[in-house]
Regions:
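Structured, hydrophobic secondary-structure cores that serve as assembly/anchoring elements
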Residues: 1-124, 172-177, 220-223, 302-585
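Short intrinsically disordered coil segments
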Residues: 50, 133-137, 150, 232-234, ...
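Autoprocessing Asn-cyclization modules and mimics
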Residues: 102-121, 126-200
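A short, compositionally biased
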Residues: 113-115, 163-167, 207-216, 556
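Short, cationic low-complexity segments
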Residues: 141-144, 238-242, 580-585
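Short, surface-exposed secondary-structure junctions/capping segments
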Residues: 148-153, 241-269
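Small/polar beta-strand repeat architecture
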Residues: 175-256
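Long, low-complexity, polar/charged, intrinsically disordered or flexibly structured peripheral segments
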Residues: 254-300
Length: 585
């Protein structure tokens, strides 16, 4: 109903239908990788969105190993990456044998010798063994005096001022020879109330001093620290120490083991002056299963499988497979690396919206690269060779190329689009490659669908290939596969409104119209070949694609054909020399 129609109707309540319930189709963000690997700390097996390398270090720390996840993430952002997802893996099944990952922690006792507080690191790892936690009493922010005597059994008191007192405040009563503590349940005018009766007497002419008891907790990790002030011992307080720490600390969790005790018994007798202990990394016992993970349903998806339902991800990278080979008991041969890489490609094939970026072990040579390529035949994977040399903290380190390649893909998508081949692009933050390749070497690798990385003299070090691992010529190029994957993601996201609509010709026409408009714009943007839209794509959604059988099964079927642009891999010069013709005259 239009606003003009309402002008000519009497006042009342009218229903206005909205026929534009669907969202116009648009391209999703692309070039978003999911990384799986080893970190110093951070949530285990739970994907974390990371927006910069500094953000990565804040979440996951800086592992004191020559592993490859951190330099891969750094290389991704250095080369133009926008954001990514990271899953930290550790072996969690080896706790009984003493080899699995474990949280560091400590148990603290109060003045009575009872265990009062349990401190546990937020995540597994030996990093927690360097944590120091200090409980420190604070001087009172306010003080007041008792104005009426208190007898044993009292549950309320009249005081000179209630400024600085509120529900949950732990209050100390003190005269010349004794102290008592209560947790306030109510504050009203110049009266305070509590639940547990006092067992001693306090006189107003004592005098009896009242003050709120607060403290602070300081947590140190190296030169960094977290500090939480004005904390309360009472669970009824908004500043209850366990609640504040558990909601705001990035490093530890605290459990109050004596919540029913009197407030003065809930805290440690003195500051913890030694580090937490017992933290283990669980890295030496990593297996392929730890990287692959498991899918036990929502909230229980681990490792690589945790990415399967994050549809924003369109690249997969696991550079730490190469570190595990030779460093962990579960990766004794290259076959174990191959198992995980096959699962990467398998996930990409199941989701149809991502590509696995693969690499070889460090000491592989040219022939090894050609042999590794034969292990795969899929347009959902791409293989890069050789490794890169980077400088970290003044030391040269060789790293797998997947993180840097993911950054180049993200940069190319941002500057041009997913239809542009992510090749002939300079790799930033790299000083050399592990093995130099001649033009003939690179050509041979390219012919066998291995993407070479080559120094190009003054043009820097560049990715010199854009091929998938498919033997199908139609799906040979990365940009072709990524165009198709991007379309899948766009259609999956923006056609959700179709679900439960009446499956009738009117719906088919709307779907055909919207997809045609969308693909026409992509053709204008250079994503498809063809001089006209008819040459570039077609959309079919009619009675032919939606038979009675399909409709009875609750399906609406749309057939789409596109012709993505392909890269120019070779530049051919044809030169002809003409001899001067003799002058017969």
């Amino acid at each position: 109903m239009t606003n003009n129609a309402l002008r000519y109707r009497p006042p009342g309540l009218y229903r206005e239908s909205d026929k534009n319930r669907y969202t116009p189709l648009s391209l999703p963000d692309t070039g978003i990788p999911g990384f799986v690997g080893i970190t110093e700390r951070g949530p285990t097996n739970r994907p974390q969105k990371v927006t910069s390398y500094e953000h990565f270090l804040r979440l996951f720390g800086n592992l004191n190993l020559d592993s490859y996840l951190a330099p891969a993430v750094q290389g991704y952002f250095t080369n133009g990456g926008r954001h990514c997802y990271v899953v930290r893996v550790a072996n969690l099944s080896g706790l009984a044998s003493g080899k699995g990952a474990r949280h560091g922690g400590a148990l603290l006792k109060n003045a009575s010798g009872k265990t009062a507080v349990q401190i546990t690191a937020q995540s597994e790892g030996s990093w927690a063994n360097d944590l120091r936690v200090t409980f420190r009493a604070l001087p009172p922010r306010t003080q007041t005096l008792l104005t009426m005597d208190l007898k044993p059994g009292a549950t309320s008191a009249s005081i000179r001022s209630t400024h600085g007192f509120k529900r949950g405040t732990v209050v100390q009563f003190e005269d010349d020879d004794k102290k008592a503590h209560v947790s306030l349940s109510k504050v009203d005018s110049k009266q305070i109330f509590w639940n547990e009766p006092l067992d001693v007497e306090f006189r107003s002419d004592g005098p009896t001093l009242l003050e709120p008891i607060e403290f602070e907790i300081e947590i140190r990790l190296g030169e960094n620290r977290e500090k939480f002030s004005n904390l309360s011992r009472s669970p009824a307080s908004g500043s209850y120490f366990a609640r504040v720490i558990n909601e705001r600390s990035e490093w530890v969790k605290i459990l109050d083991l004596l919540p029913e005790e009197l407030p003065n018994n809930r805290l440690p007798a003195e500051a913890l002056k030694s580090p937490l202990s017992g933290g283990r990394d669980g890295v030496d016992s990593l297996t392929p299963s730890d990287f692959i993970g498991d899918d036990r349903g929502p909230g229980e998806r681990y490792g690589l499988k945790a990415f399967e339902f994050i549809h924003e991800i369109d690249l997969l990278c696991i550079p730490d497979l190469m570190w595990c080979l030779g460093h962990t008991m579960g990766f004794r041969t290259e076959k174990h690396v191959e198992i995980v890489q096959h699962e990467m490609v398998g996930q990409a094939e199941r989701c149809r919206d991502r590509i696995a970026i693969l690499e070889l072990p460090e000491k592989s040579d040219y022939k090894d690269a050609l042999g590794w390529r034969t292990l795969f035949d899929s347009s959902y994977g791409a293989l890069y060779f050789p490794w890169l040399e980077i400088e970290r903290d003044g030391v040269l380190q060789r790293v797998p190329p997947s993180g840097h390649v993911a950054g180049i893909i993200s940069r190319t998508d941002e500057e041009i689009g997913a239809h542009a081949p992510p090749a002939n692009q300079d790799i930033r933050g790299v000083v050399d490659v592990s093995q130099p390749l001649s033009p003939d070497d690179a050509g041979m690798l390219n012919g066998d669908c291995v993407n070479a990385v080559r120094p190009m003299n003054a043009r820097g070090i560049r990715v010199w290939g854009a091929r998938t691992l498919s033997s199908d010529p139609m799906l040979r190029y990365i940009n072709v596969q990524r165009v198709l994957a991007t379309l899948v993601r766009a259609l999956r996201r923006d056609l959700q409104w179709v679900v439960f609509e009446p499956n009738v010709p009117a719906l088919w026409k709307i779907i055909t119209r919207d997809i045609t408009l969308f693909l026409t714009q992509l053709w204008r943007d250079g994503m498809f070949r063809g001089n006209t839209p008819e040459d570039a794509f077609y959309v079919k959604c009619n009675a032919e694609t939606n038979s009675e059988e399909e409709r009875d099964a609750g399906r609406v079927v749309v057939e789409i054909g596109v012709s993505p642009v392909r890269p120019a891999e070779y530049i051919v010069f044809r030169m002809r020399q003409e001899l001067e013709k003799p002058d017969l005259d």
